[in-house]
Amino acid sequence: LPVHAVKIAQELENRGLANATIKNYKSALDGLVVFAKNNLNNETVTPVRPWIVANPLADVSISNYGAKKRSWEALTEDQLHHLFSLLMLGKDRLLLTILVTTGMRLDEAALLQWDQVKKDKNGITYFDLSMGALVKNDKFSARLVALPDCLSLPKKATGKLFNFKLDDDGKSAKDASRYLNEKYLHRVRFDKNDDRKVVHSLRHNLSGLLQNLVPTPSSEHLDWITGHDMEGAKTASERKRTYNQDIDLSIKYEIVNRVKHPWLK
């Protein structure tokens, strides 16, 4: 089995699959072997004993197989100006503006419904991502997203803000990403080697702009704004119990409003 696992990893690498995908394959094989170890017994012998007494794949490393994950890069200021100077449909401009000013994930924004657009008692407009199915399996992505003053929404309507196709998992990121990249993001790349600039880059842009604020907001505040995994002093259960008390919407609003977006003018 260890030899077979390595051969499988080699074959998947030859097909151009990423290391993370190959790890998923091995994880599935691990699960199958562990199930067999725990549930399948040789009943032709006395006493009955398991066919497999240990997982022979446990120590097989596939860290050197497959393409390593490539991280996306934030757009340069020139590219941001170029992007928002392009002629585009109103809904496309709205979505790109939401991404660069809030740091939301593409799927979070592409799946927005008008009933998620709300105002708090202080008149702060926000997207309510605290309820319903999450696009990321992370409880901390459930949050309230404060909208800065530079983000203007059209007149409130009903249904979805955007109309991208849903995949089998009920997500829109694949269709939205393909469309926005081909129509806009690819056009602002410097050359063919500048291939890490995609629509997801706008989330990186907002993260970088937030971190460059003076004074710099705490990492916990930044995490609550963008919905990243939380790594502060509180445990997950403590954070869940105190959700909406950890960081007030007005704090998020004040922070995102400090970020300047001259490319939107």
Where is each model-derived feature located?
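N-terminal core-binding DNA-recognition domain of tyrosine site-specific recombinases/integrases
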Residues: 1-34, 170-175, 195-201
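Basic, Lys/Arg- and aromatic-enriched nucleic-acid-binding interface segment
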Residues: 19, 23-28, 38, 58-106, ...
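C-terminal catalytic core of tyrosine-transesterase DNA break-rejoin enzymes
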Residues: 20, 97, 101, 108, ...
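Hydrophobic recognition helices of helix-based DNA-binding modules
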Residues: 32-36, 155-157, 210
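Short, charged phosphate-coordinating catalytic segments
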Residues: 34-52, 95-123, 218-224
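Catalytic-site neighborhood detector that most strongly recognizes the C-terminal catalytic loop/helix
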Residues: 74, 133, 226-264
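Conserved tyrosine-mediated DNA breakage-rejoining catalytic core shared by Y-recombinases
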Residues: 102, 111-154, 235
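Active-site/catalytic core of tyrosine-dependent DNA strand-transfer enzymes
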Residues: 146-194, 200-201, 205-206, 213-214
